């Protein structure tokens, strides 16, 4: 039995401890925000927060989340921080096709939680584990800067 907190709710699962968290989130909880991209922890499409820090759920076995807290984009989307980031992404054109957006939003939350006023370079480093083929990153960096300014006091 593996116990953990998922998007604020206590969860108990009797599954193989080597099961990938990504598969469990999508197949058992119907949480489709985390996506299968590369399956190797390189693209960030599967990003979630583990005790407030970004991790790639495609590489994370259930055994590693026992007694921990997982937040997916679905859980994060219910917060004021998410609203500030989503508004900034829309305003700055930081989201186009949407494939990377959930993971990018999780990366931005993790970054801003640790550093509420990051420089452009710190943002680029903070999102470096997330690939985006549409925006060229400049609009995403600008969106995170905008969210940090407009959401002053949220992080």
Regions found by a protein language model. Give the residues of each.
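Signature of N-terminal electron-transfer/Fe-S-associated modules in redox systems
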Residues: 1-155
């Amino acid at each position: 039995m593996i116990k953990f907190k998922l998007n604020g709710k206590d969860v108990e699962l009797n599954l193989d401890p080597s099961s990938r968290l990504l598969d469990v989130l999508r197949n058992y909880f119907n949480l489709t925000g985390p996506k299968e991209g590369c399956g190797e922890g390189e693209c960030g499409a599967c990003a979630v927060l583990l005790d407030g820090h970004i991790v790639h759920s495609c590489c994370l076995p259930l055994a590693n989340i026992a007694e921990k807290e997982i937040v997916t984009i679905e859980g994060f989307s219910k917060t004021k921080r998410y609203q500030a980031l989503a508004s900034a992404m829309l305003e700055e054109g930081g989201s186009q096709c949407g494939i990377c957006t959930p993971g990018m939003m999780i990366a931005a939350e993790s970054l801003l939680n640790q550093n509420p006023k990051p420089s452009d370079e710190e943002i680029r480093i903070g999102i470096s584990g997330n690939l985006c083929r549409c925006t060229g990153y400049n609009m995403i960096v600008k969106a995170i800067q905008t969210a940090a300014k407009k959401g002053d006091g949220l992080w």
